Amino acid sequence: MEEYCRPATLEDLKALITSLNQQEVDYLLIGGYALFAHGYHRATTDIDVLVPATEESGRKVRKALMVLPDQAAKDIDPAWFNEGGNIRVADAFVVDIMLNACGETYETLKQYSETVDMDGLLIRTINLEGLLRTKQTMRDKDMADRAVLERALEVLQEREKSRDHGFGG
């Protein structure tokens, strides 16, 4: 039952990502922990992973999620992934398997993908522009994240402009 789930920890994230990598799952980390991977720390209680909406992806994801303490993923039917709806796995902590995030899919967001090294663990996530595309709801936390992401993108663009007008030729 979801109300008995504890917040996901950084160690939970690392264990999950390690398993996703070992199972060769096509995934993109999104949500609060993706922001964390980019250096923005805010409270989050779950792990959000965007994956392709295919049965093959479902098989790999289910196998990868079997590292979770309560093995709640054993009840996942890989055929559900063809339906395109998001899947909430309420284990010791919550993992949201996203097939759609604000109208964006794995296919539409993979162009924004990048790999972040977190303590030697390679995590596939999306850049700030991609994250901004997943934060287009009216939820308070998404509006706050959107403001931070928009400002961060402005700063990066200003840095690029100053580099372009710098020394050298």
Regions found by a protein language model. Name each.
Residues M1-G169:
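Compositionally biased terminal segments of proteins
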